[in-house]
Every structure is written in C-alpha cells, then in structure tokens.
C-alpha cells in the first residue's frame, strides 16, 4: 500500500414525488466500506479487485433510486481519461437486497464525466444504477456489494464523506466511507477543498 490518501464522496438518491421533505421525516443513514485484494479471476481488468459494501436507510417511505461515488472534486486535476484508464468493472457491477424481501437487484456502473445534474454536481463520479424489474426493486433500506478493478494498488481513503440525497427533495445526509481506493496517478481533490467529515446533514 502506498502513502497516498484519497478523498472520496459517496452519494445515494431516493425516489420521491415531493419537492421538500421535512428534517423530522428524513432521518437517513448511509455507510460504506471499500476493501481490496489481488485479482484472481479477472486479472485482465486489473491486478486489484475492489469491493464496496454499502448499507442505506432513506429514512422516508421513498425507496433508493441510485447512488453516486464522487471521485473528483473542484480543484483536483483528475480527468475523465484518468478514470477511464484506472477503473474497470463487469456488468452488472454489483447486487443489493430488494423488495419484496428475499429478492436481489443488480446494478449497472457508469462513469459520468459531467457529474449529476439532479443535485448540481459537475464533478467526475461513478454512478450505480439499479436494473429494476416488476418483481424486484431497491427498498427504503438495504445492503449491497459492488465490485470494480484497477491496475493501481490500494491507497487509504482520506477525509471521506458519504451522502444520501433525496433526488427530488432538499435532504442531504452524510455518513462514513472507509477503507481504500486505487492510488490514482492524479489528485482527485485540491488540498484546500472543503472537508465534510464533521457534517452530518444539511438542507438547501
């Protein structure tokens, strides 16, 4: 493991038809951890296999819509080419629990170079989109496991934050993202970038 530290943000979105959800009704929770091990079955995609384990609770009656892993922050010098070269994954990228209870939901992974317009983010991010069916969809709570590969060895995640955002509402929640991430050859964030580590939630 090298001495670099990586700053990342993970954001999840809940489906909603409301324009605003009150703070009292939206006590959400999200937490994730990334682990790494030498790749033994997909070495053509990268020498290292990374696994993101995620738990969520939207705190409302609205189910998970999708979630984003924000990789590059304002002031950083990573570009889309850096990420395209550094990250690989299979289809589906992962799986989570679903509703009704006992079913499983698969997810597609997308590298979005222009961010997520639903919350006015224009930075590089990895989007995890559920492949829904009439028989199984993500719920208001759940757990998921997602896998990607890289030629770059793991580096500790520094000053992480995890945010759960209602896609059509005003709620933003933050929780811990721990573990490791590929030690990218670029800098995902500027040294003066804002740290969200102590912020639990905010309402715009």
Task: Walk through the language-model features, giving the residues of each.
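Bacterial N-terminal signal peptides
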Residues: 9-18
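Sec/Tat signal peptide C-region and signal peptidase I cleavage site
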Residues: 20-26
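Extracellular or exported targeting regions of proteins
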Residues: 27-186
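A short, hydrophobic C-terminal helix/tail in secreted or cell-surface proteins
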Residues: 192-203
